[in-house]
Amino acid sequence: MPDRLKAVLAYFQQSVPFRLVPAAITTVFLVFMLLLPVPDGLTPKAWALVAIFLTTILAIILKVMPIGVMAMMAMTIVALSQVTSTSSKGAIADALSSLANPLIWLIVVAILVSRGLKKTGLGQRIGLMFISRLGRKTVGIGYGLAVCELVLAPFTPSNTARGGGIVHPIMKAIASAFGSDPAKGTERKMGTYLSLVNMHANTITSGMFITATAPNPLVVDYVARVTNQSLHLSWTTWALCMLLPGLTCLLLMPLLLSVLAPPEVKATPDAVDYARTELQRMGPLSGGERVMIGTFGILLVLWANLPAMVFGPAFTLDPTVVAFVGLFILIITGTIDWDDVLSEKSAWDTLIWFGALVMMAEQLNKTGVIAWFSALLKNGIVSAGLGWEAAAALLVLLFVFSHYFFASTTAHISAMMLAFLTVGAALVPPQYLTPFLLMMVAGSTIMMTLTHYATGTSPIIFGSGYVTLGTWWRVGFVMCVIELVIYAVLGVMWWKLLGIW
């Protein structure tokens, strides 16, 4: 019998595509949740939906299987259990409802558009151009990487693709060219510093544009929901609100990191030569790169609603429509082809997992779970005797620093943000609600600085071996606090100047 059991376990380890122990933990957790008494104020179906949602989040955190598979599992269980409807037909309609959400398709199409950056080589060229102009000192290279991130951010909704797939290879090549190699114990010459710049530029720029990271449209949806659509963050409004505090963080970040993790090599005149040599090797702009530049220009003009400003509101275009226009331009010009679209796995993966999380968030709201949890949280804060200012600060800090327990920004936002926003909307006076909401919006990307597993970019950069775990966490905490202070002081004043509140 022991031999047969060992054989069965060996089969599972070799053939079954999920991690056995995390899967068992997740299953036990689901059963445990379903066996608990239904809390007062919730229906049995609503509590079952809570169990499914929390189990999905746990499965994502434990990485039982890829996030897309876990999301599809959640959709299947929601449909099978009929927790959102009285019929199977209604339940499957609910489970698939969010796949028609324009915000989700905005991210999917923008990922497809961003594929052109890598295919044409324009992303690499942009990075090398900035380094060729700013790279005479190590800090200057840091600024070059930061500006590269800023330029690419509006068009690359996968911060992982941007920071890990475009900027990080450039950073590694530069570090290697100066003899900074973790395998040789020389990572602190330059690589540690540049890796941290690579990471923190990625998180800062992720918060500056709706289309800079995948969960941002979900944040927009939550903010609109808790304000009954009175505060709807358009692409332009988001970018304008985050412009000054975001640029301030981006300008200070390379200097701060040069103090927190100083590079041993300060002057790097050869970096300019390296970048110029690579640019010469690449040659002049290709036709594909020119089309990409033109397409990005069109996207920026349309996302900024300039036609509507000039010709009137009849020319206003939804951001998702604009993204489709950009994708169509790239396809009909041959810059990318249909096979590129089909093979961009991250886009279709995002459609599934993002759709499932949005769907469950919507159903939790419809079934009264969010209102129930928000009331519990609100009552707890009120019973503590906190004023609204302290309550607002506590909500922001709890939300941001609870990210230590999450390995996915999307999972964290899906699990907690709507409830925290709802509580804030109930406690903060109406005239001060907008700055609170915008601080929560900023915190949703600032928290990505904290750990080496905080977002998809983190393990890519950390895995290169240039930064130790202790350094990563220490620098991440300090930068998180500094960025929160910048947004809380400069950001709030900037939003007041803009007339947002």
Residue ranges and their predicted role:
Residues 94-178, 193:
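Hydrophobic or amphipathic alpha-helical targeting/insertion segments
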Residues 160-176, 195, 208-227, 270, ...:
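Re-entrant/interfacial helical elements at transmembrane boundaries that shape
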Residues 55-62, 116-129, 133, 332-340, ...:
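C-terminal ends of transmembrane helices
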Residues 1-106, 226, 230, 236-375, ...:
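Hydrophobic transmembrane alpha-helices of multi-pass small-molecule transporters
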Residues 107, 139-153, 179-206, 232-241, ...:
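Alpha-helical transmembrane segments of multi-pass membrane proteins
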Residues 177-183, 243-246, 355-360, 370, ...:
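C-terminal transmembrane helix pair
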Residues 58-66, 148-158, 200-210, 305, ...:
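Transmembrane alpha-helix interface/packing and boundary motifs in multi-pass membrane proteins
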Residues 178-266, 457-493, 501:
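Membrane-core helix-loop-helix motifs of multi-pass transport proteins
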